[in-house]
């Protein structure tokens, strides 16, 4: 036999199905999923259950190309909305693939390599397959080391972290009206580490809770200082969905505002469009509580994810931040210019402000309508 491949499949967000319905329904979803996957496999592939919502596919005599073909069929099928017993649900599949003997000299080593690949698929956004490589192993080792360094930093009072403030300018008056608090990390071993790398690690580990509280408190203190010179100044702070999942966030927010003697209207909390578009009842209730405190809510990265106009109607946001991708070449790109103009007009009509990321001063003359 030329080769043996192992694909490990995991059902994305399966826990949400159990939480939304119940475990008995989840068990039926597992059974249906196994049947569907088995029906789509070639004769040289064997399906077995590994653990929980995780399955293994042993591919005899196949290779990564065949594995990718199999996964492509599965992905196409499971991207669609599923239904059972009158209940609808979504459950995509993530996968990791490894081959014998190159990626493991025995079953346990092969399974470990396939699981590392699956882990990478999850980190990269789920609903995809990753083929094992030494780069994935090196990336995993780096992430584990960065996580330990992050823990050390948090224990040492966020040593190595600084907060930079990106100015926000009113395009009509040209006056500075606020700033966004952006965290930067200079790691003792790796130097400057991108937020795109350390923020997901913090979210996965729970470190985002104390980290988010630290940024918000620092931002409030800085806002209070700048308000001495400009009373209408506001500070924007990014909020992670993990923070909202903690039941005591509203309590922390209220206490922090009181401790800094800061008017709630000076704080804008930013949540991504993708998260808000999928917001459930508990999240919407928390957003309503934040607004009752007087804090403003911004929808970040508008235009990147769902771009649902319904979300502008159903979610009471005060500010819509149009993604920076629409700014590039705006003076010569008719679509981008029209998009920004249309969304701005719509937001004004429903009482929300718009903020365009990286909308530099030399573009102001072309867009005095913001």
Give the residues covered by each predicted segment:
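Catalytic core regions of nucleotide second-messenger enzymes
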Residues: 48-50, 78-94, 122, 191, ...
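Catalytic core of bacterial c-di-GMP phosphodiesterases, primarily the EAL and HD-GYP domains
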Residues: 129, 171-180, 205-283, 358
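Conserved long alpha-helical elements within nucleotide-processing catalytic cores of c-di-GMP signaling
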Residues: 1-5, 12-42, 48-52, 56-60, ...
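Catalytic-core segments of nucleotide cyclases and related cyclic-nucleotide turnover enzymes
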Residues: 68, 72, 85, 100-126, ...
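Active-site core of bacterial EAL-family cyclic-dinucleotide phosphodiesterase domains
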Residues: 142-201, 238, 299, 356
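The catalytic core of metal-dependent phosphodiesterases that act on cyclic dinucleotides
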Residues: 15, 254-330, 342-370
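Catalytic strand-loop-helix junctions within cyclic-nucleotide turnover domains
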Residues: 58-67, 85-88, 93-110, 135-138, ...
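C-di-GMP signaling machinery
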Residues: 101, 120-162, 172, 202-206, ...
